[in-house]
Amino acid sequence: VLGSLCLYFWGTWWFLIIYLAYCTWWGGADAIWHECGHRTAFNSKKLNDFFYHIGSFMNSFEAVRFRWSHSLHHNYTASIDPHDFEVDGSIFWKPKKLINFLMIFIPGFGLLNLNKSIQKEILEHAFGIQTKVMKECIPDHKKSSCIFISRIYVFIWLIIIGSSILLNSFLPILMFLVPKFFATLNIVWRLTQHMGLQEDVKDHRLSTRSVRLNPIFSFIYWKMEYHIEHHMFPSIPSYNLPKLH
Protein backbone atom coordinates (compact mmCIF):
# COMPACT_ATOMS: atom_id res chain seq x y z
CA VAL A 1 0.00 0.00 0.00
CA LEU A 2 2.73 2.46 0.97
CA GLY A 3 4.67 1.56 -2.17
CA SER A 4 1.62 2.27 -4.33
CA LEU A 5 1.11 5.60 -2.58
CA CYS A 6 4.75 6.47 -3.23
CA LEU A 7 4.21 5.86 -6.94
CA TYR A 8 0.98 7.86 -6.94
CA PHE A 9 2.47 10.89 -5.16
CA TRP A 10 5.84 10.77 -6.96
CA GLY A 11 6.86 14.30 -7.85
CA THR A 12 4.91 15.95 -5.02
CA TRP A 13 5.86 16.94 -1.48
CA TRP A 14 3.55 14.22 -0.15
CA PHE A 15 5.98 11.68 -1.56
CA LEU A 16 8.61 12.61 1.06
CA ILE A 17 6.32 11.85 4.01
CA ILE A 18 4.94 8.66 2.52
CA TYR A 19 8.41 7.53 1.45
CA LEU A 20 9.76 7.84 4.99
CA ALA A 21 6.84 5.72 6.22
CA TYR A 22 7.59 3.21 3.43
CA CYS A 23 11.25 3.07 4.47
CA THR A 24 10.30 2.52 8.11
CA TRP A 25 8.11 -0.39 7.07
CA TRP A 26 10.89 -1.68 4.80
CA GLY A 27 13.23 -1.51 7.78
CA GLY A 28 10.89 -3.93 9.53
CA ALA A 29 12.57 -6.58 7.40
CA ASP A 30 15.24 -6.45 10.11
CA ALA A 31 12.78 -8.31 12.33
CA ILE A 32 11.91 -10.76 9.53
CA TRP A 33 15.59 -11.53 8.98
CA HIS A 34 16.12 -11.94 12.70
CA GLU A 35 13.13 -14.10 13.57
CA CYS A 36 13.43 -16.31 10.51
CA GLY A 37 17.15 -16.62 11.17
CA HIS A 38 16.27 -18.15 14.53
CA ARG A 39 13.72 -20.31 12.65
CA THR A 40 10.96 -19.36 15.08
CA ALA A 41 8.64 -17.41 12.75
CA PHE A 42 7.18 -20.51 11.07
CA ASN A 43 6.92 -24.19 11.88
CA SER A 44 8.44 -24.95 8.49
CA LYS A 45 12.24 -24.76 8.14
CA LYS A 46 11.84 -24.06 4.41
CA LEU A 47 9.53 -21.09 5.02
CA ASN A 48 11.88 -19.71 7.66
CA ASP A 49 14.85 -20.00 5.32
CA PHE A 50 12.94 -18.54 2.36
CA PHE A 51 11.88 -15.40 4.22
CA TYR A 52 15.25 -15.23 5.96
CA HIS A 53 16.88 -14.70 2.57
CA ILE A 54 14.29 -12.09 1.54
CA GLY A 55 14.69 -10.19 4.81
CA SER A 56 18.47 -10.45 4.56
CA PHE A 57 18.53 -8.90 1.10
CA MET A 58 16.15 -6.11 2.09
CA ASN A 59 18.48 -5.26 5.00
CA SER A 60 21.69 -5.74 3.03
CA PHE A 61 22.52 -8.37 5.64
CA GLU A 62 24.30 -11.01 3.57
CA ALA A 63 22.64 -14.23 4.66
CA VAL A 64 25.66 -16.45 5.38
CA ARG A 65 27.72 -13.77 7.11
CA PHE A 66 24.90 -12.75 9.41
CA ARG A 67 23.84 -16.28 10.27
CA TRP A 68 27.28 -16.87 11.73
CA SER A 69 27.90 -13.41 13.19
CA HIS A 70 24.49 -13.51 14.86
CA SER A 71 25.27 -16.88 16.39
CA LEU A 72 28.43 -15.36 17.84
CA HIS A 73 26.40 -12.34 19.00
CA HIS A 74 24.17 -14.60 21.10
CA ASN A 75 27.02 -16.69 22.49
CA TYR A 76 29.31 -13.74 23.21
CA THR A 77 27.05 -10.69 23.49
CA ALA A 78 28.99 -7.40 23.53
CA SER A 79 32.23 -9.36 23.74
CA ILE A 80 35.61 -7.87 22.85
CA ASP A 81 37.35 -11.20 22.22
CA PRO A 82 35.83 -12.94 20.36
CA HIS A 83 34.61 -9.76 18.76
CA ASP A 84 30.83 -9.26 18.63
CA PHE A 85 30.43 -7.63 15.22
CA GLU A 86 26.77 -6.82 15.90
CA VAL A 87 27.64 -4.70 18.95
CA ASP A 88 30.67 -2.89 17.62
CA GLY A 89 31.75 -0.68 20.51
CA SER A 90 34.76 0.92 18.87
CA ILE A 91 33.06 2.08 15.67
CA PHE A 92 29.28 2.44 15.94
CA TRP A 93 28.05 2.30 19.50
CA LYS A 94 30.53 4.71 21.10
CA PRO A 95 31.45 7.36 18.52
CA LYS A 96 34.17 9.77 19.57
CA LYS A 97 32.05 12.84 18.79
CA LEU A 98 28.42 13.44 19.74
CA ILE A 99 27.73 15.03 16.36
CA ASN A 100 28.79 11.81 14.61
CA PHE A 101 26.27 9.90 16.69
CA LEU A 102 23.43 12.34 16.09
CA MET A 103 24.00 12.37 12.34
CA ILE A 104 23.15 8.68 11.96
CA PHE A 105 19.52 9.61 12.70
CA ILE A 106 19.32 11.92 9.67
CA PRO A 107 17.37 10.06 6.95
CA GLY A 108 19.71 9.20 4.11
CA PHE A 109 22.90 10.14 5.97
CA GLY A 110 24.26 6.62 5.51
CA LEU A 111 24.52 7.28 1.78
CA LEU A 112 27.25 9.81 2.59
CA ASN A 113 29.11 7.29 4.71
CA LEU A 114 29.21 4.26 2.41
CA ASN A 115 32.86 3.64 3.22
CA LYS A 116 31.75 2.25 6.62
CA SER A 117 28.55 0.62 5.40
CA ILE A 118 27.50 -3.00 5.37
CA GLN A 119 27.04 -2.60 1.61
CA LYS A 120 30.77 -2.03 1.25
CA GLU A 121 31.40 -5.27 3.12
CA ILE A 122 29.13 -7.12 0.67
CA LEU A 123 31.09 -5.66 -2.25
CA GLU A 124 34.34 -6.80 -0.65
CA HIS A 125 32.99 -10.30 -0.15
CA ALA A 126 31.67 -10.36 -3.73
CA PHE A 127 35.22 -9.71 -4.94
CA GLY A 128 36.52 -12.49 -2.71
CA ILE A 129 38.18 -10.19 -0.18
CA GLN A 130 38.39 -11.83 3.23
CA THR A 131 37.26 -9.20 5.71
CA LYS A 132 37.78 -9.33 9.46
CA VAL A 133 34.26 -10.64 10.03
CA MET A 134 34.73 -13.36 7.40
CA LYS A 135 37.99 -14.50 8.98
CA GLU A 136 36.68 -14.52 12.54
CA CYS A 137 33.04 -15.62 12.17
CA ILE A 138 32.52 -17.70 9.07
CA PRO A 139 33.81 -21.31 8.92
CA ASP A 140 36.11 -22.05 5.99
CA HIS A 141 33.60 -24.38 4.34
CA LYS A 142 30.97 -21.59 4.33
CA LYS A 143 33.12 -18.77 2.97
CA SER A 144 32.45 -19.69 -0.66
CA SER A 145 28.70 -19.52 0.04
CA CYS A 146 29.15 -16.05 1.55
CA ILE A 147 31.02 -14.91 -1.57
CA PHE A 148 28.39 -16.44 -3.87
CA ILE A 149 25.41 -14.83 -2.14
CA SER A 150 27.24 -11.49 -1.96
CA ARG A 151 27.62 -11.67 -5.73
CA ILE A 152 23.90 -12.35 -6.10
CA TYR A 153 23.15 -9.24 -4.03
CA VAL A 154 25.48 -7.11 -6.16
CA PHE A 155 23.93 -8.53 -9.34
CA ILE A 156 20.44 -7.57 -8.14
CA TRP A 157 21.71 -4.10 -7.20
CA LEU A 158 23.04 -3.68 -10.73
CA ILE A 159 19.68 -4.76 -12.18
CA ILE A 160 17.92 -2.13 -10.05
CA ILE A 161 20.39 0.57 -11.10
CA GLY A 162 20.07 -0.51 -14.73
CA SER A 163 16.28 -0.31 -14.47
CA SER A 164 16.54 3.26 -13.21
CA ILE A 165 18.77 4.17 -16.14
CA LEU A 166 16.46 2.54 -18.68
CA LEU A 167 13.35 4.13 -17.18
CA ASN A 168 15.13 7.46 -16.72
CA SER A 169 13.75 7.52 -13.18
CA PHE A 170 15.15 7.27 -9.65
CA LEU A 171 12.08 5.32 -8.53
CA PRO A 172 13.56 1.78 -8.82
CA ILE A 173 16.58 2.87 -6.77
CA LEU A 174 14.44 4.67 -4.19
CA MET A 175 11.95 1.82 -3.86
CA PHE A 176 14.26 -1.20 -3.86
CA LEU A 177 17.87 -0.18 -3.25
CA VAL A 178 18.16 2.60 -0.66
CA PRO A 179 15.11 2.42 1.70
CA LYS A 180 17.36 0.99 4.42
CA PHE A 181 19.28 4.28 4.50
CA PHE A 182 16.12 6.22 5.32
CA ALA A 183 14.76 3.87 8.02
CA THR A 184 16.03 5.96 10.93
CA LEU A 185 13.31 4.90 13.37
CA ASN A 186 14.56 1.36 13.01
CA ILE A 187 18.02 2.56 14.05
CA VAL A 188 16.51 3.97 17.26
CA TRP A 189 14.85 0.66 18.07
CA ARG A 190 18.01 -1.31 17.34
CA LEU A 191 20.18 0.98 19.46
CA THR A 192 18.05 0.27 22.53
CA GLN A 193 19.14 -3.39 22.54
CA HIS A 194 22.71 -3.10 23.83
CA MET A 195 23.96 0.48 23.63
CA GLY A 196 25.65 1.84 26.75
CA LEU A 197 25.50 -1.48 28.60
CA GLN A 198 28.28 -3.69 29.93
CA GLU A 199 30.71 -5.49 27.66
CA ASP A 200 32.37 -8.86 28.20
CA VAL A 201 29.82 -10.18 30.69
CA LYS A 202 27.86 -13.41 30.46
CA ASP A 203 24.76 -12.03 32.20
CA HIS A 204 22.29 -10.94 29.51
CA ARG A 205 20.57 -8.67 32.02
CA LEU A 206 23.73 -6.53 32.10
CA SER A 207 24.49 -6.47 28.37
CA THR A 208 20.95 -6.33 26.97
CA ARG A 209 17.93 -4.07 27.43
CA SER A 210 14.17 -4.44 27.02
CA VAL A 211 12.04 -1.36 26.31
CA ARG A 212 8.41 -0.46 25.69
CA LEU A 213 7.20 0.49 22.21
CA ASN A 214 3.77 1.65 21.10
CA PRO A 215 1.61 -1.01 19.39
CA ILE A 216 2.42 0.14 15.83
CA PHE A 217 6.18 0.20 16.36
CA SER A 218 6.02 -3.09 18.26
CA PHE A 219 4.16 -4.69 15.35
CA ILE A 220 6.77 -3.52 12.82
CA TYR A 221 9.56 -4.64 15.14
CA TRP A 222 7.99 -8.05 15.77
CA LYS A 223 8.11 -7.63 19.59
CA MET A 224 11.92 -7.56 19.56
CA GLU A 225 11.82 -4.73 22.09
CA TYR A 226 11.65 -7.55 24.66
CA HIS A 227 15.31 -8.12 24.03
CA ILE A 228 16.53 -9.41 27.38
CA GLU A 229 13.90 -12.12 27.16
CA HIS A 230 14.99 -12.94 23.62
CA HIS A 231 18.66 -13.28 24.56
CA MET A 232 17.87 -15.45 27.57
CA PHE A 233 15.46 -17.69 25.62
CA PRO A 234 16.31 -17.31 21.88
CA SER A 235 14.21 -20.31 20.84
CA ILE A 236 10.96 -18.67 21.98
CA PRO A 237 9.07 -17.01 19.07
CA SER A 238 8.97 -13.23 19.26
CA TYR A 239 5.16 -13.15 19.46
CA ASN A 240 5.41 -14.97 22.80
CA LEU A 241 8.00 -12.62 24.30
CA PRO A 242 5.42 -10.25 25.90
CA LYS A 243 3.91 -13.21 27.73
CA LEU A 244 7.37 -14.35 28.82
CA HIS A 245 8.13 -10.82 30.04
Outline where the language-model segments fall:
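Non-catalytic, topology-defining segments of multipass membrane proteins
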Residues: 1-24, 57-176, 238-245
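Membrane-embedded alpha-helical segments that form the functional core of polytopic membrane enzymes
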Residues: 7-31, 50, 54-64, 179-183, ...
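Transmembrane alpha-helical segments that form the membrane-embedded catalytic/substrate-channel core
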Residues: 23-36, 62, 66, 112-118, ...
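Acidic (Asp/Glu-rich) catalytic motifs at the cytosolic membrane interface
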Residues: 26-45, 66-78, 189-196, 220-238
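Short hydrophobic/aromatic-rich motifs at helix boundaries and adjacent loops
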Residues: 38-43, 130-134, 157-160, 213-218
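Juxtamembrane helix-capping/reentrant segments at transmembrane boundaries
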Residues: 41-60, 82-98, 202-214
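Generic recognition of well-ordered alpha-helical segments
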Residues: 53, 187, 243-244
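Long, positively charged, glycine-interspersed low-complexity recognition regions
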Residues: 203-227, 231-245
